[in-house]
Amino acid sequence: MPPVPGVPFRNVDNDSPTSVELEDWVDAQHPTDEEEEEASSASSTLYLVFSPSSFSTSSSLILGGPEEEEVPSGVIPNLTESIPSSPPQGPPQGPSQSPLSSCCSSFSWSSFSEESSSQKGEDTGTCQGLPDSESSFTYTLDEKVAELVEFLLLKYEAEEPVTEAEMLMIVIKYKDYFPVILKRAREFMELLFGLALIEVGPDHFCVFANTVGLTDEGSDDEGMPENSLLIIILSVIFIKGNCASEEVIWEVLNAVGVYAGREHFVYGEPRELLTKVWVQGHYLEYREVPHSSPPYYEFLWGPRAHSESIKKKVLEFLAKLNNTVPSSFPSWYKDALKDVEERVQATIDTADDATVMASESLSVMSSNVSFSE
């Protein structure tokens, strides 16, 4: 998976987040030789594998859906590498690779028209087939998207608003392409972290809003950013036929920069989330595969995930990744609609029962009044 250099796993032990100074941050993008050498082996890397640039037509080999359902290419990250026997405890060491560049994007930077229908269904192959100039330009713009995402995450951690002027400073030499770069950065923020960038006031200030709510209304954790990670996990389980091995789950999480036993400044400690918090919350089921030696574990959807019609949310997530609509997954879409219909019908039945009970109560009261008279 192509890493995006410089996006850190921030230290969340500090209770008072420090202010993000743009000048300091920009200076940090041009490290000394010593700093570059340290950064090459550092473990502070975020993988934006859900970028179209990182999609692979071979993805279905690992996360293929049910046999009757063809998974559109580019829906999920390429996981054709060998699966580890246990979840890695930290990111891989070694020099950083170029950002978002393992495969060419189904979105062509050179055309700057995401609405172009000619791009849909087109197999773009690999970046090796591009002219050097176009490949270099794609690399540079992908890099600017990665830098902007990094800066936005730092602003989010510091609980600070961000201005358009600050964002323009990040892409200063490519400000003519700022609308496209910002649009891609927004997509990453929402898909990977469940954070939407909302403009408020006349001064072009932007604040962050959590967009993924999975819990019951009124619950304290409704709309928390870690819910976006849960959507990713549920999506993998869904695509794998409602059951995914622990190894596959961690392979995906490692690809987005989330590692077992390592605190993530947005998601927190992931192993605890997966095996305790979400299991106790009945969003996930974590069980040992019978007769496995050594013990082998797998994840399934928990009862609460089913009851809250999350299939629909998962389909919406997958559709966004593939720049399509949920109905592009016919059998899954049908299942999701069935869940929604059953939930609506249950609500109607409950309301009908309440109406009947109220009518019976009124009849009894009327009878009592008549008898008293």
From Swiss-Prot:
Pfam families: MAGE. Keywords: Cytoplasm, Nucleus, Tumor antigen, Ubl conjugation pathway. It is found in: Cytoplasm; Nucleus. Residues 85-94 have a biased composition (Pro residues). Residues 1-102 are annotated as: Disordered. One of its GO terms (biological process) is negative regulation of transcription by RNA polymerase II. GO terms for molecular function: ubiquitin protein ligase binding. Residues 40-60 have a biased composition (Low complexity). This is Melanoma-associated antigen C2. It comes from Homo sapiens (Human).
